[in-house]
């Protein structure tokens, strides 16, 4: 038998999932995708290979995967990285994932650790080791909160490549001045450089979602241009939230509640070198950091 005829699992590689395998596993495990958990399972091997390649992860990486589901992306990651830590909120899927990996990638099974937890609330103490990269098909209904939470809680994360709803991907990667630039854009940029990294069609999912998907890459700043400790992050995020809560108003008016009064907001804006007549959508992350650092 030639190498081409030997099943991938027998060669120490993962046997990736296709449409038939995904449906068979779902039936075997009694899994019915739920909108509540934002579950849409990828069933295309080429798509998961592309995600892993775009993430740029390798043997030196410990990858954090959120919402591994039936294991499509997990198997592709195990082929190329040192370790995968999969965080799964669904207890049934969390229990079944090691079984799938043992069956389809027996030589790679020891690289997988499954954590049964809510990624939006998971604590560093629950994550074994220090993950260097986040690679995930994030549940669309909580994608941004999960992304920001993990970058806040896990300073070891150097990069992220996530699949999210296309509209969310556009907002995360938007630049100041854009109509879609907003809270997700600025907060993501607080941690690192953000860019769109590709598009993913609906046909590669089961069940087929009603929306298109997109890939977003975030590379954490190697040398942060501002303090990224929890206290400063909370201060900066509070200003961002206030500025966009009344998007159409000038910052002098929009930040009146945050600063105590419109007059005090104007004083602090001027101290930060920002025209009081500006609007939040024109400010980059650096401007919000300067504003948060002004003194009442």
Curated annotation (Swiss-Prot):
This protein's GO CC annotations: cytosol
Subcellular location: Cytoplasm
Reactions accelerated catalytically: adenosine(1518)/adenosine(1519) in 16S rRNA + 4 S-adenosyl-L-methionine = N(6)-dimethyladenosine(1518)/N(6)-dimethyladenosine(1519) in 16S rRNA + 4 S-adenosyl-L-homocysteine + 4 H(+)
Coiled coil residues, start to end: none
Annotated GO MF terms: 16S rRNA (adenine(1518)-N(6)/adenine(1519)-N(6))-dimethyltransferase activity; RNA binding
SMART domains in alphabetical order: rADc (SM00650)
Annotated Gene3D superfamilies: Ribosomal RNA adenine dimethylase-like, domain 2, Vaccinia Virus protein VP39
Primary location recorded for the protein, binned into one broad class: cytoplasm
Entry EC number(s): 2.1.1.182
Keyword Transcription regulation attached: no
Residues reported in the UniProt entry to bind S-adenosyl-L-methionine: 40, 42, 67, 88, 118, 137
Matches recorded under InterPro entries: KsgA/Erm, rRNA_Ade_diMease-like_C, rRNA_Ade_Mease_Trfase_CS, rRNA_Ade_methylase_Trfase_N, rRNA_adenine_dimethylase, SAM-dependent_MTases_sf
UniProt keyword rRNA processing present: yes
Pfam families: RrnaAD
Family to which this protein belongs: Belongs to the class I-like SAM-binding methyltransferase superfamily. rRNA adenine N(6)-methyltransferase family. RsmA subfamily.
PANTHER family noted in UniProt: DIMETHYLADENOSINE TRANSFERASE (PTHR11727), DIMETHYLADENOSINE TRANSFERASE-RELATED (PTHR11727:SF7)
Functional note: Specifically dimethylates two adjacent adenosines (A1518 and A1519) in the loop of a conserved hairpin near the 3'-end of 16S rRNA in the 30S particle. May play a critical role in biogenesis of 30S subunits.
Protein name: Ribosomal RNA small subunit methyltransferase A
């Amino acid at each position: 038998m030639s190498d081409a005829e030997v099943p991938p699992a027998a060669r120490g590689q993962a046997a990736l999932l296709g449409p038939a395998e995904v449906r068979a596993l779902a039936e075997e495990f009694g899994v019915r995708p739920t909108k509540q958990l934002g579950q849409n399972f990828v069933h295309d091997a080429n798509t998961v290979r592309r995600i892993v390649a775009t993430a740029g992860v390798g043997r030196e990486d410990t990858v954090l995967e959120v919402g591994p589901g039936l294991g499509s992306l997990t198997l592709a990651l195990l082929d190329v990285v040192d370790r995968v830590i999969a965080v799964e909120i669904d207890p049934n899927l969390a229990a079944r994932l090691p079984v799938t990996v043992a069956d389809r990638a027996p030589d790679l099974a020891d690289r997988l650790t499954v954590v049964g937890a809510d990624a939006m609330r998971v604590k560093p103490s629950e994550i074994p080791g220090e993950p260097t990269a986040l690679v995930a098909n994030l549940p669309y209904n909580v994608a941004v909160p999960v992304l920001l939470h993990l970058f806040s809680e896990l300073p070891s994360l150097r990069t992220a490549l996530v699949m999210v709803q296309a509209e969310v991907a556009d907002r995360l990667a938007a630049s100041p001045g854009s109509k879609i630039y907003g809270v997700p854009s600025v907060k993501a940029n607080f941690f690192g450089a953000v860019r769109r990294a590709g598009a993913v069609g609906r046909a590669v999912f089961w069940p087929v979602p009603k929306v298109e998907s997109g890939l977003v890459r975030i590379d954490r700043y190697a040398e942060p241009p501002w303090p990224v400790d929890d206290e400063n992050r909370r201060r900066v995020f509070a200003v961002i939230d206030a500025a966009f809560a009344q998007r159409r108003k000038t910052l002098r008016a929009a930040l009146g509640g945050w600063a105590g009064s419109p007059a005090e907001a104007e004083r602090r804006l001027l101290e930060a070198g920002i025209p009081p007549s500006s609007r939040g959508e024109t400010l980059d992350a650096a401007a919000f950091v300067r504003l948060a650092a002004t003194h009442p």
